[in-house]
């Protein structure tokens, strides 16, 4: 977390537009195998989060003792996180900017699928101050967001909303990286972000449990999680406007997040309800060389990491696709004899919220004198092909069949096609009708 304006030296910043910015959902995201969304948020393994912290600590130790903007330790931290996400199936974009004469980096990771017009973002700053490794500030938030993203991959989660994760550079110089990202988003892309969740310092050694009160829906989501644990929360005031949610909020994007305290002092009342030591700072090593692996409270880190996942699973679900919405094309399409090219019959789907279900129904009615000649595919709006029929059925005529397709990685709205090809000579037919039901 950066110092407030009154408590830090003014950061002299020179922006330079460099490289691509990750403003939009990539046009063609290669989705992993489609699986049904996990029914409940997962427990994020504390050991995994701490393993990421250990890696960040080692990176700092090998690069002058810190992971600050413009230093080798920061770029190595970005490379570590990016490698994990690339291996897990995310589409990553490295965004560059210039501040204080040095190149800075933001890392954006998009999870395939979800409604591209309704994006849920979660992020944290990855840089430290120059005086230390920054394990709580903000290795803790960065590691929790990373492990939650990896949990999304492990679950094959396909929520209604599109999921995007961000790791920001040069936060400690005045929110430079996140400002750069937001300022370079076109207005249309900003409008697609339904919420941004920020996690900055969530493993403080003398922790409190603070919830941002900016957006009421996001705030209540976190409060519901902690109520389920029987842990009271307070509204976060110490870092208000001092972390990477501020540029999003200033752009009119709903924001929320968690915080476990920095250099404010824990009161007796707070110690009574949360434990810990009253009269001491929530983090006595804030912006100091002692912000190391020993500067983490495991209970706070574990609870807050689980809260990150709870919010992603809950807020990402959005409004489920109403069952039973059907779209049909009854126009005849001739299927020419081999070796002619395949033919397609389109259906335009609109007004459906989110993704197609894992049990998408496709009803096919093809009149043909030899169905064993036919290859029939469902082609999704993004071009993904789902094979329905591949030359089976022998010499029987006509293909009248209902298929169940796991299309949960596909946005429902758009143009779907039934594609049919005759692969052998002497028989002909036509597509009589077909229907897709969500």
From Swiss-Prot:
Disulfide bonds: 285-290
Residues annotated as the enzyme's active site: 171
Activity dependence on pH, as recorded: Optimum pH is 9.0.
GO molecular function: aminopeptidase activity; calcium ion binding; metalloexopeptidase activity; metallopeptidase activity; serine-type endopeptidase activity; zinc ion binding
One family name in Pfam for this protein: P_proprotein
Top-tier EC class: hydrolase
Protein activity control: Activity is inhibited by metalloprotease inhibitors and activated by Mg(2+) and Ca(2+).
Keyword terms, alphabetized: Calcium, Disulfide bond, Hydrolase, Metal-binding, Metalloprotease, Protease, Secreted, Signal, Zinc
Entry EC number(s): 3.4.24.-
Compartments (UniProt record): Secreted
Residue positions binding Zn(2+) 2: 137, 172, 287
Cofactor remark from the record: Binds 2 Zn(2+) ions per subunit.
PROSITE patterns cross-referenced by the UniProt entry: P_HOMO_B
InterPro entries: Galactose-bd-like_sf (IPR008979), M28_fam (IPR045175), M28_SGAP-like (IPR041756), P_dom (IPR002884), Peptidase_M28 (IPR007484)
Function of the protein: A leucine-specific metalloprotease that plays a role in controlling the amount of leupeptin during colony development. Degrades leupeptin into three components, acetyl-leucine, leucine and argininal. Has a strict preference for leucine at the P1 site.
Similarity remark: Belongs to the peptidase M28 family. M28A subfamily.
PANTHER family on file: METALLOPEPTIDASE M28 FAMILY MEMBER, PEPTIDASE M28 DOMAIN-CONTAINING PROTEIN
Protein's name in the database: Leupeptin-inactivating enzyme 1
Organism: Streptomyces exfoliatus (Streptomyces hydrogenans)
Gene that encodes the chain: lieA
